């Protein structure tokens, strides 16, 4: 990985918003804050930027039917996506061109669950709305927590058909515990070769144990000269975990040396971590 040129992303929105709010939103996760306490989203962005982030990510990870339906908010999807885009864009504008906005394109069902990945036609229907409504607000698209080759195809094909001309960053989630395979068990090289047909600008890993990410980056370096990066979890994800069930994840503390091996951190990481 080329450490002479680094881009610092932001970190977790969902956990940080929940911590500040002291409320327990489960079903719709961070999307609830677009309806209530939306000022907190801007505050979190500002703190990440003050700590060195050069990119902020739209709060659209859970503005999709699978999450919104848990609270009967499916009809609010378009409005919530637009509001998320506006908040991110308005925050970036305050910094006079120094901050880029990444449009978050998430899995369409639970994260970390390749067994729940939709087929292409089902995915196109939802991604089309998300991409179309985000496009006026973002500088590039960040496909996050992608867990299989099929999900890779689903999201990249959707972006190709929309044809916005904006860069695409593709971020896979790997199996935890020092693995270099996607959560589907498929290899990084196989996923990369499929993705290259769509020519994304950058490849990343996210929502994964740091040890697996370190191993994955070594392999990714051998495959491409494009931008590569990572934003790991500080916990490991057990099999069968979902946002709503009671299966507990295992939190890990990391040293500063382990931190700087990655471009950014994600879930359960706070703005203050960046000021090391």
Task: State where each predicted segment sits.
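Glycine-rich, proline-tolerant flexible connector loops at the mouths of alpha/beta enzymes
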Residues: 29-35, 55-77, 142-152
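N-terminal small/glycine-rich loop or linker at the start of catalytic domains
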Residues: 2-35, 61-68, 97-120, 172-179, ...
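Alpha-helix-loop-beta-strand connector modules within alpha/beta enzyme cores
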Residues: 73-94, 156-170, 223-228
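Active-site beta->alpha loop and helix N-cap motifs at the rims of alpha/beta catalytic domains
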Residues: 55, 81, 85-131, 140
């Amino acid at each position: 990985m080329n450490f002479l040129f680094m881009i610092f992303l932001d970190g977790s929105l969902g956990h940080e918003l929940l911590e500040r709010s002291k409320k327990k939103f489960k079903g719709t996760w961070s999307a609830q804050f677009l309806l209530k306490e939306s000022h907190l989203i801007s505050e979190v962005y500002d703190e990440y930027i003050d700590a060195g982030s050069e990119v902020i990510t739209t709060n659209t990870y859970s503005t999709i039917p699978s999450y919104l339906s848990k609270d009967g908010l499916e009809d609010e999807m378009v409005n919530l996506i637009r509001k998320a885009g506006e908040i991110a864009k308005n925050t970036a504008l305050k910094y006079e061109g120094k901050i880029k906005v990444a449009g978050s394109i998430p899995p369409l069902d639970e994260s970390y669950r390749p067994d729940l990945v939709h087929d292409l036609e089902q995915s196109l229907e939802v991604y089309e709305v998300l991409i179309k409504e985000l496009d006026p607000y973002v500088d590039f698209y960040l496909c996050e927590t992608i867990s299989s080759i099929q999900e890779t195809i689903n999201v990249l094909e959707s972006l190709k058909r929309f044809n916005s001309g904006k860069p695409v960053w593709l971020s896979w989630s790997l199996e935890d515990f020092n693995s270099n395979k996607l959560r589907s068990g498929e290899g990084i090289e196989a996923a990369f070769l499929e993705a290259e047909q769509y020519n994304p600008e950058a490849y990343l890993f996210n929502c994964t144990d740091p040890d697996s990410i370190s191993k994955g980056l070594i392999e990714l370096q051998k495959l491409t000269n494009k931008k590569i990066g990572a934003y790991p979890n500080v916990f490991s994800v057990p099999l069968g975990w979902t946002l709503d069930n009671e299966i507990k994840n295992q939190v890990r503390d990391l040293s500063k040396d382990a931190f700087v091996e990655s471009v950014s951190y994600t879930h359960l990481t706070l703005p203050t971590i960046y000021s090391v």
